[in-house]
Amino acid sequence: MAKKILLCDPTLRDGNHAVRHQLTRESFAAYCQAAEAANVPVVEVGHGNGLGASSMLVGECLLSDEDIFTISREHLHKSRMAIHLIPGFCTIKKDLTRALELGVDLFRVASHCTEADITDRHIHFVRNSGKEAWGILMMSHMTSPAVLLEEARKMESYGAEAIVIMDSAGAYFPDDVKERISTLVNGLTVPVGFHGHNNLGMSVINSVVAVQEGATIIDGTIRGFGAGAGNTQLEVLVAVFERLGYETGIDLYKILDAADIAEKGFNPVAPSISPLSIVSGLAGVFSGFAKPVAKAAKDYNVDPRDIFFGLGERKAVAGQESLIYEVARDLAKRNENSVEKGQ
């Protein structure tokens, strides 16, 4: 019997990073219809940084969370509607309660890879409300497999029904994935998943290795639409898993049709492994920093690659966008001092 893989599609959430959180009503409606037709089991929607995150700090969303959920819910019937949420951005009283009222099916409660403690109240609230909650560990390359397991066990103890690790910076090689996924699969009683980014061109093979090591949940976005160099490309995953004998339940032809719809409707620059994306992966810095890093480099007349490596040294994580300009200012000052000394 073929092994079943649950493919989750965060195109309408992670993909929002690629257009500065400006996906339109028409884009949400059209893509939800296409994903539903292709039998995509889970469709994640929202601001790129999740529920309640729209702000000047990380980017203001064109649509409100409420509008996004209402539009998406209207077109998702077989497919489950999921959201990403980070405690701190997302409050229980204001945001989570309303998301429940608007029909969200699956809540992916996320934290930095060493800060699972902050998810306790949110996971408990979702579970006590009768809905499904998963634990998401972001920037998972920044700690060891042993610590990841400790943090994942915390989420499991809070009631998380699955644990997904995110390679948020696209920094992993297959051996990194193998070590971490096998550790989690052997140490947890809930399903384990993997969310890849393609900064170093490894996202598809990393996803395959994750499945070979026991992961049963894999994330992918249509056309790789997402932060930085993009996510693991969903339609490629469907084709590759079909070739390898895994069962996803997704209609290959219809997901390829969805890719065409997205390409024409979203009007993004097609995800590619740009020089900055490579540096982001090497530095281990969140892929979504690419655009603000480029702007800061221009504003301060410094090399954006140096900004990325500076952010890596400071172990910057998503939500710390203010560090980008701090690093840029420090580099500009250092360059100015070097010029003065050389005179």
Curated annotation (Swiss-Prot):
It holds the Pfam family HMGL-like. The keyword NAD does not apply. Its EC number is 4.1.3.39. Residues 5-256 form the Pyruvate carboxyltransferase domain. One of its GO terms (biological process) is 3-phenylpropionate catabolic process. GO terms for molecular function: 2-isopropylmalate synthase activity; 4-hydroxy-2-oxovalerate aldolase activity; manganese ion binding. PANTHER family: 2-ISOPROPYLMALATE SYNTHASE 1, CHLOROPLASTIC-RELATED, HOMOCITRATE SYNTHASE-RELATED. This is 4-hydroxy-2-oxovalerate aldolase. It comes from Pectobacterium atrosepticum (strain SCRI 1043 / ATCC BAA-672). The gene is mhpE.
